[in-house]
Curated annotation (Swiss-Prot):
PANTHER family: PROSTAGLANDIN REDUCTASE (PTHR43205), PROSTAGLANDIN REDUCTASE 1 (PTHR43205:SF7). Putative quinone oxidoreductase that may contribute to the degradation of aromatic compounds. The gene is yfmJ. This is Putative NADP-dependent oxidoreductase YfmJ. NADP(+) binds at residues 156-159, 182, 198, 222, 244-250, 277-279, 327. The keyword Metal-binding does not apply. Its EC number is 1.-.-.-. One of its GO terms (biological process) is response to toxic substance. GO terms for molecular function: oxidoreductase activity, acting on the CH-CH group of donors, NAD or NADP as acceptor. Induction: induced by stress due to exposure to 2-methylhydroquinone (2-MHQ). Keywords: Aromatic hydrocarbons catabolism, Detoxification, NADP, Oxidoreductase. It comes from Bacillus subtilis (strain 168). InterPro entries: ADH-like_C, ADH_N_2, GroES-like_sf, MDR_fam, NAD(P)-bd_dom_sf, PKS_ER.
Length: 339
């Protein structure tokens, strides 16, 4: 094993859309595991839109990344040194630094079963991504058979799972995405009833009206911004709006840039519920969600797409691509193969 490795640090806080200069590659020693720790080798790294918020030094639901320190997130890794409970060769998942090797407490890692699904799936549909879709839609959205569910960011990892769960529940599903390829994916592969390319639609409001002639009962909001403003005009009485993300405004340079139409009057008139949520709120029910997702996956009711970028050095590029809509499904970076 080499004595040194690469680590990716936050070099500066982004102004608007992140750029390569916001990241720094550092050569650091491979750590020696202490008592209760194991050494793990990074196999896959997950990059997610929420990480953009952590790059700012502002109060949020999770601590910001520190300047000149490693960024971190969901990682699939291989144990390369025996511990008390984990053994060399075990494949594990954890929230780890963006580096090639890490010394980690065994309690911070969870062994995964790669006989049920490929390791990468545990960062996507069987991980936080799938659980976000599951709890956000079913606990807040509560779709009923025959209702119309609209999903923005529908070809992304969360959105595509939301739409499929809504179909399982008997809803009519309309997805919003940003390319013809993604529209075909939603309609042909995932069986969405309608899909709208917001980048080519002449009038997003009219396109939504045509796709939702009976109005909108559930809107799973992944993007915020003008797309969400248009959906709000079509809410039915007692509509439910789980607010999962606001990727359209993550790169706003000030709060003023994030200002849009006021929705209070629409919520009052339709007696609708709009609720933000964080998947960690449901941590005591993760086993419930994971079990159901695995059953649906095994039964062929859920399908998932991954965009896998090769190479540790390409982690920043993969992250930046999230904000350009370059990924279809879950964006991952493959760093290495198991031994």
């Amino acid at each position: 094993m080499t004595a040194s490795q690469q680590q990716i640090q936050l070099a500066r806080r982004p102004q608007g859309i992140p750029v390569h200069e916001d990241f720094r590659f550092e050569t650091i020693p491979v750590p020696e595991p202490k008592q209760g720790e194991v050494l793990v080798k990074t196999l896959y790294v997950s990059v997610d839109p929420y990480m953009r918020g952590r790059m700012q030094d502002t109060k949020s639901y999770v601590e910001p990344f520190a300047l000149d320190k490693a960024l971190s997130g969901g990682v699939i890794a291989e144990v390369v040194s025996d511990g008390n409970h984990l053994k060399k060769g075990d494949i594990v998942i954890g929230n780890l630094s963006w580096q090639e090797f890490s010394a980690v407490s065994e309690s911070a890692l969870r062994k995964i079963d790669t006989s049920l699904a490929p390791a990468s799936a545990y960062l996507g549909i069987l991980g936080m991504t799938g659980l976000t879709a599951y709890f956000g839609l079913l606990d807040i959205g509560r779709p009923k058979e025959g209702e119309t569910v609209v999903v923005s960011g529908a070809a992304g990892a969360v959105g595509s799972t939301v739409g499929q769960i809504a179909k399982i529940k008997g809803a009519r599903v309309v997805g919003i995405a940003g390319s013809d390829e993604k529209i075909d994916y939603l309609k042909q592969e995932l069986q969405f009833d309608e899909a709208i390319n917001y980048k080519t639609a002449d009038d997003i409001q009219k396109a939504l009206q045509n796709a939702c002639p009976d109005g909108v009962d559930v809107y799973f909001d992944n993007v915020g911004g003008p797309i969400s403003d248009a959906v709000m005009n079509l809410l039915n009485e007692f509509a439910r709006i789980p607010v999962c993300g606001a990727i359209s405004s993550y790169n706003a340079e000030s709060e003023a840039d994030d200002m849009g139409p006021r929705v209070q009057s629409k919520l009052i008139k339709t007696k609708s519920l709009m609720q933000g949520f964080i998947v960690s709120d449901y941590s005591d029910r993760f086993s419930e969600g994971a079990k159901q997702l695995a059953e649906w996956l095994k039964a062929g009711k859920l399908h998932y797409e991954e965009t896998i970028t090769e190479g540790f050095e390409n982690i920043p590029d993969a992250f930046l691509g999230l904000f350009k809509g370059e990924n279809k499904g879950k964006q991952l970076i493959k760093v290495s193969d198991p031994s």
